[in-house]
């Protein structure tokens, strides 16, 4: 018992021993009656030697006498700010307001921690970084260059916030994520995993960027949108609402992915294209130009939707099919294989265009009609009902192929002819 009391008394004495003093002959006047005092070590501790000069504090409450915490160089700790634990503040760094630097954290260079902000654990703030308001920088996180973390934002784990980046609002950057350049992460946004947000990109609202995803350039991810996997959103692209871009998908240029849309696999959406509604674009599909894929439409495989084309409803464009120019595919229609729909052509209802077929001009294919093989329907021709155009057949002019008619082989139907069948 005696030994235990002796040890306890020793620890108490050690904890109350002052490790530094305030020098009254080396001060800085800040105005408003505030004086800062340089500190001098009274004992050796950590890497600090007895007699070593430190930085400046306003009062002893700014730097804890226990632990190895230290302020050195021309660093300043003022107001109700605290440096505790084994934390280090040095260079020209400033810790002000009611801020706290604790644990093994370091605040270096011209960095500033102010207001009610806290830098803890093994976190680092250096360069011209600023951590303010109620922000938290924890774990092994680093905030540096001219980066700023403010409001209620958090940066944790091994995350990095660099360059001129800002993390604001209730945003959280964690894991091994990077936010750099002039990027902004705000609102309730989360950037996690190995994600990268750079350039002038923005991640806002309740958006999530995670995995190995990259959001760069002037891209904007907002709403409840998700960018995950190895996906890339670049240029002036926008992903919003509850849309998701994942896998190895890329959305770039001025493209938009909105609504409940899903772009995944190796799909690419570029130029001024728009994928919206509950549409899905996946596989190796590409949506480019001013094309629009919306509703519950699916574009997949190696399909291409380009120009001013529109794919809507529950339509499907798949295989190596192409829908281009001002063409429209809608309702439950399907364009598949190596088929092509171009110009002002329309494919609707439950119609199918497949094989190497080509529907062009102002042609219309609808009902449960089928155009397949190497068939070609063009000009103002209409193929509808249960009609079929197959083989190497050609249908053009103002022709109507209707009923159960079957135009096949090398047949050619033109002018104002109407072909019907029972």
Regions found by a protein language model. Name each.
Residues 1-66:
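Terminal amphipathic alpha-helical/low-complexity segments used for targeting or macromolecular assembly
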Residues 70-418:
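Intrinsically disordered, low-complexity repeat regions of secreted/extracellular protein precursors
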Residues 420-422:
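Low-complexity/repetitive intrinsically disordered segments
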